[in-house]
Regions:
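Short, hydrophobic transmembrane alpha-helix segments
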Residues: 25-35, 53
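Interfacial loop-to-helix junctions that mark the boundaries of transmembrane helices
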Residues: 9, 31-37, 90-102, 217-225, ...
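Long, contiguous bundles of hydrophobic transmembrane helices that form the permeation core
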Residues: 2, 7, 231-318, 329-353, ...
């Protein structure tokens, strides 16, 4: 415990030193022209650097925001009062009072509530019992794990938690190691979420983009997200062929001999949260279907579909935040009514799920809020104009930009343990670089291909590290994908 306290103290001191260093630099050499200069990159560089060093995203983003406020105030000559105005009023308050941002947060909170309700209702348990009676052999167990992961594409946390708890007894029965179960779950959850237009990832990504329809941009990135498609194809091949290689083959050989853990003690085995015994398979499938249908209806409604606009145009021009929040709230009402009608959940249990669902989404809300505020600081300092000028002056750098972003995203997410925090930092920088091109989207109706490819690279890099990392906290995510322990929520929500 004492060691943990010292670790947090050292991180706090390091952050304060960065802020102090910034202040000293300003005092020593007053900044008069920070906008559009190298100084404009200072806030995101600090955020990324601190995240890599401390492996903690919240404080890193906040220190980056604070540094941006200090530089902006110094350049404007407004002093410390200007710093707090830039950070609090122009940053936090403005972003949290933005209708689009609030709509995204509402959708995430409602999604968290629905996740809790579906877990309590027992549909996952019922599916597990059905699968245990019908699945034969190792290939069947592995493919069933994959297909269930594809079905639950609305959220990677819900995906990991549900698939892990449902399929664990079945894969244990067929002597599939926990390591392979973790691989199957992790290699399906994030990849399927980043190519699903109705998901928490789609909402989060659209919330980091300004000046263009976020959902439309997200949909355009899907064909370019080769990482997701290749990973899914690899899972299908490994599951269907029952092929293993490298360290996984060692785990699987041990599992075939009865050792599914490849260890003498099962440190991470914990009891799952209690669920009702009255749940059926339909209690899992129907709520997911209702959520998808009503969210799509909500989005095309905001795009003018019911006023005569064709489906594709309505979906492309929808107000994603309003449509998703409208659809998810409608779905929540229907799901609660359905569960109460089926008598799988009581009214009090449904109401208790509201607070529990909100609590699950707090880390995601913090990451998005800080990412929005950091983007405000970089916009104030005109970082996009500076980076855009550098990129345009170096043609080779422009061509390699997607590769650079992919590598940076992998490194950042690997070190911090947060994929959401990674694209929350990088995507605003990308959109700032292409501000001029994005300004014409409303007239042309076409999003520049380089913007789409660069954002795809950010998403692919962020999602790749969910599977690669063996450093805390993400190592726990993979173990908990197989064991579905109660403490899994923290590591997964770091994303």
């Amino acid at each position: 415990m004492e060691k943990k306290k010292k670790s947090y103290l050292s991180k706090a001191v390091f952050g304060l030193l960065i802020v102090a260093f910034t202040v000293c630099c300003i005092i020593a050499a007053p900044i008069t022209e920070a906008k559009g200069t190298l100084w404009s990159l200072f806030p995101p560089v600090i955020a990324i650097g601190l995240a890599l060093i401390t492996k903690e995203v919240y404080s890193s983003l906040f220190v980056g925001i604070l540094s941006g406020g200090i530089i902006y105030a110094a350049a404007s000559g407004t002093g410390f009062e200007g710093t707090f105005k830039a950070v609090v009023q122009d940053g936090l308050i403005t972003n949290l009072s933005n209708a689009y941002n609030v709509g995204i947060l509402v959708f995430l909170v409602v999604l968290g509530i629905i996740v809790v309700l579906m877990n309590k209702a027992g549909g996952s348990r019922a599916y597990g019992e059905w699968a245990a009676a019908h699945i034969k052999g190792r290939r069947g167990a592995a493919l069933s794990t994959f297909f269930l992961g594809v079905l639950i594409f609305v959220d990677d946390y819900f995906n990991c938690l549900t698939v892990g708890s449902v399929m664990r007894p079945i894969t244990d029965k067929h002597n599939i190691s926990r390591s392979k179960l973790a691989y199957l779950i992790d290699s399906t959850a994030a990849p399927i979420c980043i190519i699903a237009p109705i998901s928490s990832w789609a909402a989060a990504v659209s919330g980091t983009v300004e000046g263009v329809n976020g959902i439309s941009l997200f949909i355009n990135t899907i064909p370019y997200n080769l990482y997701a498609f290749l990973t899914i194809l690899m899972v299908i091949f490994i599951s269907a062929s029952d092929t293993d290689y490298g360290p996984m083959k060692i785990h699987e050989d041990n599992a075939k001999n009865g050792d599914i853990f490849t260890t003498q003690n099962n440190t991470y085995e914990q009891d799952a949260q209690p669920v009702t015994e009255r749940g059926r398979v339909i209690d899992l499938i129907l709520p997911v279907a209702v959520l998808i249908v009503l969210c799509v209806v909500g989005m095309i409604y905001t795009g003018g579909f019911f006023s005569g606009t064709d489906f594709v145009t309505a979906f492309a021009n929808c107000d994603a935040a309003y449509g998703l929040s409208l659809g998810s709230i409608s779905a929540l009402i229907v799901i609660i009514a359905y569960y109460m009608f089926r008598r799988v959940l009581k009214f009090n249990e449904c109401m208790d799920s509201i607070a529990a669902g909100f609590k699950q989404m707090v880390p995601a809300i913090l990451i998005l809020t800080f990412a929005w505020t950091l983007k405000t600081m970089t916009n104030h300092l005109e970082a996009g104009a500076f980076v855009s000028g550098v990129v345009q002056s170096a043609t080779a750098l422009s061509v390699l930009l997607p590769v650079i972003l992919f590598v940076v995203a992998i490194g950042l997410a690997f070190a911090t343990g947060t994929s959401w925090g990674t694209f929350g930092i990088l995507i605003p920088i990308v959109t700032s670089v292409f501000d001029a091109e994005l300004a014409n989207v409303s007239q042309t109706g076409e999003i520049p291909s380089m913007v789409i490819i660069c954002i795809s690279a950010c998403l692919a890099g962020a999602a790749t590290t969910v599977r690669l990392s063996r450093t805390p906290p993400l190592w726990h995510r993979q173990v908990h994908s197989a064991t579905t322990s109660i403490t899994f929520r923290h590591s997964c929500r770091m994303r």
